[in-house]
Design a protein with these regions (language model features):
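Long, low-complexity, charge-biased intrinsically disordered regions
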Residues: 1-167
Length: 167
């Protein structure tokens, strides 16, 4: 874990953002799921913060217990974001955002963590809550394709159909 509390704004990072779908958005999605009898599945992104790409140069001491003998005082330049950095959430979100747009989803202009995909009579709605994803749709085949795409980009844990959603 990085020591984000030692970071200085405009020196070590510029932007921060936590990708959390709005409470009202998730309630609307649940209403649409119930009204249209959509499938609702849950996914969890593993090692979320390692997916973000850093724009800044960040250096880190070796974590205690993982020091290399003879090189205990060395510092290392991070290649990707890490849990604890102030910009990690934003960097993860940007990586996810561009990936999901690539397969035709459109970002909801009122909630940047809700994405919609429509094609003729097929519909998919995706809600992002940091590293947790709710995916609703009326075509199981299209949902499977979306999950396969996400799994090809990110290490995913398939949680299956959502049985209990706390909103």
């Amino acid at each position: 874990m990085a020591k984000g509390f030692t970071q200085q704004s405009s020196v070590d990072f510029v932007d921060t953002y936590s990708p959390v779908a709005k409470f009202a958005s998730n309630r609307i999605i649940m209403s649409v799921v119930a009204t249209m009898d959509l499938e609702l599945h849950q996914l969890d992104v593993e090692t979320t913060f390692l997916n973000g790409e850093l724009k800044e140069d960040i250096f880190m001491l070796q974590p205690k217990g993982f020091e290399i003998k003879g090189l205990e005082d060395e510092v290392y330049k991070l290649k990707s974001s890490l849990y604890g950095l102030k910009q990690s959430f934003r960097q993860w979100y940007l990586k996810f955002h561009w990936a999901i747009l690539e397969i035709g989803f459109e970002m909801n202009p009122l909630d940047h963590c809700v994405y919609i995909w429509r094609c003729y009579d097929e519909l998919k709605i995706l809600s992002l809550y940091v590293d947790d994803i709710l995916l609703a749709g009326n075509s199981l085949d299209m949902m499977i394709k979306t999950k396969s795409f996400l799994a090809s980009r990110f290490e995913m844990k398939e949680m299956g159909p959502a049985t209990c959603v706390r909103i």
